[in-house]
């Protein structure tokens, strides 16, 4: 069975806008539902310990929505961030909701956004038991990684299903008009992952401007997770039309790719 690269819409920024006024508008669940209406294949959230955007009740509501609508739910986050008041911890959230995919990300509490991937040599021993636990819940496990990451074969042995390529460096180079070299590095990393049986996702600073070029150069990307750019563009174009524009890019660039 095969499919084109899938689009998972990150709705964190909807929650940022809602939280800025302290009430329920805009409604995160309604926004996610609109994205699904437009054809999005999944919804992504990245809850933070400080609840700066997505909150526990959002995760529960989105889990219910995605299962009812038959699309994937992807929860991202740092598995090493300690639980605290208002945040039960990433693993507890995933245990409760059993998302289709859990993407582990090594971000610190004070980071504005994710900006690097895991160092497998240093962090692998801590990740392995967490991967085992998450897999027991029936969730697919993806690890957020930098281009040129080493240790992909080890990740496959640990039971990791996919990696998510951190595409921030590509977006910067594309904006500067000099992305050819870094695209070759991303393509090489993707092939190395696929050679050891890992599926490849991608995300961070992807936009309508740079997505097509990336997918044209990097082979067999299974899923892109896009939030900030998509929500920003939707302010001008509308949410449903914007999601459809991204789907048009996926359809125009990608032949069908094998699912892993």
From Swiss-Prot:
1-deoxy-D-xylulose 5-phosphate binds at residues 48, 53, 113. The active site is at 46 (proton acceptor), 76 (proton acceptor), 204 (proton donor). It is found in: Cytoplasm. 3-amino-2-oxopropyl phosphate binds at residues 10, 21, 205, 227-228. SUPFAM superfamilies: Pyridoxine 5'-phosphate synthase. One of its GO terms (molecular function) is pyridoxine 5'-phosphate synthase activity. The record marks 164 as: Transition state stabilizer. It is an enzyme of class 2 (transferase). Pathway: Cofactor biosynthesis; pyridoxine 5'-phosphate biosynthesis; pyridoxine 5'-phosphate from D-erythrose 4-phosphate: step 5/5. It holds the Pfam family PdxJ. The keyword Transferase applies. Its EC number is 2.6.99.2. One of its GO terms (cellular component) is cytosol. It catalyses: 3-amino-2-oxopropyl phosphate + 1-deoxy-D-xylulose 5-phosphate = pyridoxine 5'-phosphate + phosphate + 2 H2O + H(+). Its main location: cytoplasm. Keywords: Cytoplasm, Pyridoxine biosynthesis, Transferase. GO terms for biological process: pyridoxine biosynthetic process. Belongs to the PNP synthase family. Catalyzes the complicated ring closure reaction between the two acyclic compounds 1-deoxy-D-xylulose-5-phosphate (DXP) and 3-amino-2-oxopropyl phosphate (1-amino-acetone-3-phosphate or AAP) to form pyridoxine 5'-phosphate (PNP) and inorganic phosphate. Homooctamer; tetramer of dimers. NCBIfam families: pdxJ, PRK05265.1-4. This is Pyridoxine 5'-phosphate synthase. It comes from Xylella fastidiosa (strain M12).
């Amino acid at each position: 069975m095969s499919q084109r690269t899938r689009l998972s819409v990150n709705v964190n920024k909807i929650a940022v806008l809602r939280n800025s006024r302290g009430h329920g508008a805009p409604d995160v669940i309604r926004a996610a539902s609109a994205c699904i209406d437009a054809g999005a294949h999944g919804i992504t959230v990245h809850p933070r310990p400080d609840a700066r955007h997505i909150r526990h009740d959002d995760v529960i509501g989105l889990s219910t929505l995605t299962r009812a609508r038959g699309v994937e739910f992807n929860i991202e986050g740092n598995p090493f961030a300690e639980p605290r008041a208002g945040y039960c911890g990433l693993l507890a959230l995933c245990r409760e909701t059993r998302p289709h995919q859990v993407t582990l990300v090594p971000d610190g509490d004070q980071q504005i956004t994710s900006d690097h991937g895991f160092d497998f040599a240093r962090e692998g021993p801590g990740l392995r038991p967490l991967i085992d636990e998450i897999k027991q819940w029936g969730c697919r496990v993806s690890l957020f990684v930098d281009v040129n990451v080493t240790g992909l074969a080890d990740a496959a042995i640990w039971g990791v299903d996919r990696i998510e390529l951190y595409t921030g460096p590509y977006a910067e180079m594309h904006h500067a008009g000099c992305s050819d070299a870094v695209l070759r590095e991303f393509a090489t990393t993707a092939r190395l992952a696929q050679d050891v049986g890992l599926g490849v996702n991608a995300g961070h600073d992807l936009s309508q401007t740079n997505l097509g070029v990336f997918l044209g150069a990097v082979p067999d990307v299974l899923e892109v997770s896009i939030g900030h750019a998509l929500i920003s563009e939707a302010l001008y174009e509308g949410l449903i039309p914007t999601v459809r524009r991204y789907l048009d890019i996926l359809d125009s660039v990608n032949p069908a790719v094998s699912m892993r």
